[in-house]
Amino acid sequence: IDPNHRGFEMWSSGAPGIYNCKGEKISDNKPGISFRVYWDGDLQDEILNGTNLSKWNGNKAVTIHTFPGAMHCNGTKRTPNVSADLFGDWREEVVFYDANDPSKLRIYTTTIPTEHRLYTLMHDPMYRLGIAWQNTGYNQPPHLGFYIGDGLKNIPWPEMYTPRSDLFDQ
């Protein structure tokens, strides 16, 4: 979340502040603990808390987008129905109930340009597993099996298989 500190950061509801990947405290403040989302086109996570999307500025979470007409799917964590890389580039979409008619879903996607060209996140097996766990168990955001963030040089090329065309020629 913080481009000033390379690597993953961690925080929780049970401890004060944010810690870097070495366990060093980097902030006395912390963002919400609901969901992380790739949204605005840089390589840092954004924070999704209810229907508010925030960007960490090194000291606090600043709202960059709200999802009008959206309703979260539970009362305790206020999570989306699902967050996933569903369409287009590598950034994620969020799906919420329609606030006026919960029998309908609303899908939100970003229109912010990005200079980063990555393949769809669904090619990563760990990420696909994360999409499945959102709807079969404890609703948590998906995570990649590799690092995306400040200093990204190369990401592993996905193992992709296609059907053999000669199977269809018989």
What is each stretch, according to the model?
Residues 1-170:
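Beta-propeller-forming repeat regions
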